[in-house]
């Protein structure tokens, strides 16, 4: 089924879920009944007035053409070329002459750096060729990485369905390799969360984390090596995963610290999924568990490109707070996090994405100037995060509606093709 074939009511429902709104919340903002929203989403009531569609689009922060299933015009700064990635994912014929493995590894490494520096336009152009090459090389490790990069970019560009396809391909290629499967599960969880499928994301993320983390990282097994979280953590390991563990026999296996970083990332993604399900207590427990894993990492080679560590945990805590509606706590945590030394070491993509989330938190508390500062800071760190992502565009639109618009936002609105 193409986008044009999807009933308008289902598109309304999909965007409502993406905006983390219940039917009652949408009804309240439209000043209509919950029953009216339910009938629209089920197709029991026809949306045949453009003025009503415009009103819905305004509340859902999308263009009316999106709800109508019509082709959107591409605003300035938006990355195009996704069709080339779609075509590469649709290929089932194997290229006859893939590059040597060393050359492919170099290309994959370059693609990761391009993503982490938020050069999304460049990455869109690189990915079709990289996918074709990786699909012909039969290197599971490199193909999983190529699919993960692709999925991460597609989720950024609001192509979550296609992102999920790429993540699912990564999972299939990983096969029985627990570490590769765990890295692929990160992308699966991200794509499902972007689709509003938080329960499914949680179901995929937690088993994957448990397969790569030692039993001592779970709160039910604290007798092995102490209490994680904000209390006493196990003794730090070195980069080989070695350390003084007292010879305890309750571990699943200490493994490599790179695997622990993958497991910690899975826990953070699971915490965000739990928050999306409304399970705030579980989200806090999962972030505490991830904090314990992070505290046990002295330093590691981030081969799997997770950016996991204590600062990543604090970023997740802020987002969990925002998701449960406590924007004030989210902003307090953000203020503390950006003063930590590790903040500047996070990739530009990571920091830019967080600042967009921070801008949304400022909007929740009615601080338009704070939201504007966060957007301008994000643009200075990772311009494509602000200028290419549909999510950022909706935040800019919300801030730009102020009269007069805060400093810097009018310029951003113009850059992304918005008019006040």
What residue spans do the PLM features occupy?
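Short, charged recognition helix plus adjacent turn
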Residues: 69-97
